[in-house]
Amino acid sequence: MIPWNPEALELFNRHGENHRGALLALGADPDEVFSDWKALIESRAAAAGEREVEPGRVETELIPLLKSSQACPAPDAPPAVPPSPPRDPSPRAPSTLQKWFGRSTAVMLWILGVFLPLGVLVFELLAGVCAEILFDPIPTWGHALLIALVPAANALALAMGSRERVRAAGTLFRWIGRLNGMAIGIAAFYALQFILVTPFAVMAIIYFGIGFIPLSPLLAFISALAIRSRLRRARFLTEAPPPAAWWRTALPAFLLLFLLAVPRLVVPRYAPQVSDPDPAVRARATAVLRVLGSRDVLLRRCYRTQEPMDFFTLVLGGSFRGGRPASRADAQTAFYRVTGTPYSAVPPPRLKGLRGQDLIDSDWWDPALGGDQVAARIKGLTLSQSRLDGRIDSASGTAYLEWTLEFHNASPAEREARALIELPPGGAVSRVTLWINGEPCEAAFGGRSQTRQAYQQVAVRQRRDPVLVTTAGPDRILMQCFPVPVDGSMKTRIGITVPLLVPDAQKAEAALRLPRFVEQNFSAAPEVQTSVWLESDQPPLEVKGGTNGFLVLNGSPYSIRGKAPADSAASAPFLLLPLASPPPRVLSRDARLGANEAILQTLDLPEDPAGFPDALAIVIDGSARMDAHHAHMTKCLFDFLPPETRVRTWIAYDAPKTVDGKPPFHIRYAGGCDNGPALVQAAEWAAENGNAPILWLHAAQPLDSPELEALRQIADFSRGRLVIHSHQYGPGANRIAEQLADLRLIRPLPVLDDRPMEIINLLQNRSGRWHREKLAGDAIPGDVPEGSSHVARLWAAGEIARLSNPCRKTGRDEAVALARTWQLVTPVSGAVVLETAAQYKAHGLEPADPSTTPGIVPEPGTLGLLLIGAPLLLAARRRRRT
């Protein structure tokens, strides 16, 4: 191609415009004819060795072509018209009708191709109407930029409306053609996405113009095609080549949007398969979602079950082929399996871009209301006050804590506050109080199912003011209260009776780990912290944890004050206290015992404090959340495990991996893995090796495991000899422990600060164990001082555990009656506060007598014990210093 002289180009265009009407009358396309003539003139000028096309060349070549076009009609055309009379060599002015039609077409293209898609884009970013009703067309800012390219490209092309601008555009004209092709591909993709609702969109226009949202891509697509036709005609006014072929611009843009949609399309197809009974199907679906699935779409489906109404999701997602749609439970399971994080531990999803409103703030309800799981956090429900009071009686080896919580609800509906609380090791809830109309009301204690049924009847159905506390696995309770009124508050208190830990019987030390949240459905503002105030008969040796440390004030008793985080992400503070060596024996009397009965408490020392199991099975969770604790865990297992111990390790991946000996130093953690199959295999090996203990190191297990029936069978035939020592890294629920709570199989290690050696010490049987027995008559020693009544409550908790042992065929009813008498929350009992006496009577419950509930004020027996035990404690402290 050679360049054109400006005069030659002007001459060619003038002749072409003068003969356009004649060509149209012959049924030919003038633009195609002019393109062919122009190419012919260029080729002949190049063959003659000319550097550019001159006006003379145009006259020489064009006149014969014009004559031949008039003499040779097009095929199937009417007879040739006589030659037109000579015309004025100046360009023909368009008629009034042509001007009106051209301007009207341009105006419609500006409206439908520029202003409408731009307005719909801004409206959807601000309001999110399509995302709420059909599907989210703008899931990311990248999608917003691609959509904005459509009106921008159309506007640039329409701006090239005059010949002068086309000539001035130069190489820019080529880029305008490419952008137009991309706009065609983008508009075609979204027009196809809305194709299922397009027939109804026309009718929806009358409803506040909402139908323009699904119609906008189709109208923009038609406008872009019309603009491309104008660009092809305009190229005759410049030397720029024609616009690039559609498959070079439109097709790549279409495929790019489709690839961006793939992570969203695989979710509805594979999320239901993550819960499939077939392990192979589960593993394949989990692998696909981890590689291709969208975390954001999964998180949204954890809250919403509405199926997106776009073409590709319905067709490729499986809905048109009879596939089962993903339920909320499927999405929650898939989200954990893919990310390794429970959906409730992640902030609720937000509509992207400028829209700002929370999806959870739409018309959703609380699906876990009245259930036995904490579930997701609810916006507007906050912990407004938190205080922890306590009394430590180191002489009796006990402590009593009262945790007072107040919740505030700023959401537009009544809400239920739920929290999973980790108790101090061996602790038991012995008091529950709820403030009703400003007055504290004590709880009634009864059977587990009895109290839950009363709570659901009064709270969920009658929407009154109860609170329920039940166990949720070993050393954990579930607290739930409903309804927290709109713009109102609800206040409750939980009393906990705790035995002091003796981690190492060779040391004159006891430990107390404070309770903490491990999961909650409410938020705690940064300024809200738990105010801790403890009184102790002895000054603590060490206090760890808290936000700014703890302050110890001398006095009688000693005061320990500080602040602790009120969120489940924080670890629990703990105290080390002096313990007399040897610890004195203690008697405890209570009105609920017989007239001549008492509880004797002693501390049993281990026979072989340095002993270690001959064989040990280790199960390591392969979930992603374990990666942060890998260094600590491997140091514990590699540096401190005795070499003579037989060890076999299971890495709990989706399919468990077995390793003879210690675990590999490098472990690949991914997603959220079901630890049930690995525990079953470890239990089978342990049963073959003399019921060797199992050490289970894991992160949160928020989902039920379908593989535990085999583990139950092994535990039943072990007759209580099989033990799983567990340690959880980080907060979160442990549904596996809750599923197996009735077997007393899983025993959490009383770890204080996650030191590597601490786990080994606990496995070496170094700790002392409190022993409590009921004596009567002459069997009661007369030289043993009387201590706290909490010793008797802890004896009752142990007796309830013995009576409800799964190896016993009878005793459960006796255990429930004992829990009701001693007012304890155990695996067979719960505590519930109702609003009226009629509600208690209707459910066969009786609220606790306030005179029998424990309190912070020291008991008379404790004061007497202080006088006797103080010299022993003082002597122990002096020996420690020396």
Please describe what each predicted stretch is:
Residues 613-651, 667-675:
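…and closely analogous acidic/polar surface helices at protein-protein or active-site interfaces
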Residues 83-182:
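Membrane-anchoring hydrophobic segments
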Residues 862-879:
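A cross-kingdom C-terminal cell-surface attachment/processing module
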Residues 241-269:
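Internal/C-terminal transmembrane anchor helices
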Residues 632, 666-673, 677, 700-765, ...:
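VWA/integrin I-like adhesion module and closely mimicked acidic/polar interface patches used
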Residues 392, 406-413, 421-423:
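Asparagine-centered strand-capping/turn motif at beta-strand->loop junctions
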Residues 175-233:
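Membrane-embedded alpha-helical segments of integral membrane proteins
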Residues 431-473, 480-485, 491, 495-616, ...:
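An acidic, Ser/Thr-enriched
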